[in-house]
C-alpha cells in the first residue's frame, strides 16, 4: 500500500472516543498540515491543548458542543450524513489555547491543524457562512463548500474546504499542483484528502504525481480513506454509480491558494 494512503483505524483513547485517523509530521511527509478524525458516542468528550498549532474543528456528522473555556458553541453540526450535501458548522481555535468537544449525538469530527505562532480569536464558522460554488463543466463538475478559504482572515495558515463530485466526474482536474513557493505564480501548500463515498462500498481513484515523477502514485481510495499530498498534481476520478465527498486541508508558508495546471492536460479547459 502506498505511504500516501491511510486506512481508517479505531483507536479508543477513552470511553466513547475513537481516533479514526491521525496524520502528523511525525508519521507522514507533511510539515505544515496535520489531520485527525475522531468519532464520539453521545455524551463522550475529547480535549486537546494546541500549543503552537491552530485547529479547525469540523462537525462532519452529528451534533457537538465545542468550548475553548472562554466561549462555548452549543449543539453545532447540521447533518447525519455528509451526503445530505449541505454545509456544516466548524470552529476555529488558535494556537496556545485548549478546547473540549462534547458529543450531543453520535458524531464524527475532523480536526485540521497547522503550525501557528500568532494567536487569533476563536471563531464559530456557521454553515450558512460557507461559500458554496459549482465548478467545472462536462465530466469535470463538482460542488464546493468553502469553510476556511484564503479570503477569510480567520486563520494564520489553514485552508479547509469540502468537495462533492458526482458519478462519472473528475475533480481537482485538470490536474493541478501547488508545490512551489513562487507567488504570484504559484503557492506552496501541502494537502490531505479525507474521502467518503455514497454508497459506502464505493471507491475513487486518485493519482499524486510530480513533473519529474519522483512522486507517481495512483491509489484506490475507499470510503473513509485519507490521501496525503506532500507535493505534485492530485486529480480524483469517480466511477459510475457513486458520489464522492472529500474534505481538504491545506497549509503552507503563505496562506494563499494559487495553483498551476499540468500543461499536458490544460487543453481540457478550452473545450
Swiss-Prot record:
Catalytic activity annotated for this protein? 5-deoxy-D-glucuronate = 5-dehydro-2-deoxy-D-gluconate
UniProtKB keywords: Isomerase
Q: Give the top-level enzyme category.
A: isomerase
Give this protein's Gene Ontology molecular function annotations: 5-deoxy-D-glucuronate isomerase activity; glucuronate isomerase activity
Any Pfam family from its record, for instance, is KduI
Q: Does the keyword Isomerase apply?
A: yes
Q: What does the record give as EC number?
A: 5.3.1.30
Pathways involved: Polyol metabolism; myo-inositol degradation into acetyl-CoA; acetyl-CoA from myo-inositol: step 4/7
Swiss-Prot/TrEMBL GO biological process terms = inositol catabolic process
Function (record text): Involved in the isomerization of 5-deoxy-glucuronate (5DG) to 5-dehydro-2-deoxy-D-gluconate (DKG or 2-deoxy-5-keto-D-gluconate).
Family label: Belongs to the isomerase IolB family.
Q: What's the protein called, per UniProt?
A: 5-deoxy-glucuronate isomerase
Annotated organism of origin: Bacillus velezensis (strain DSM 23117 / BGSC 10A6 / LMG 26770 / FZB42) (Bacillus amyloliquefaciens subsp. plantarum)
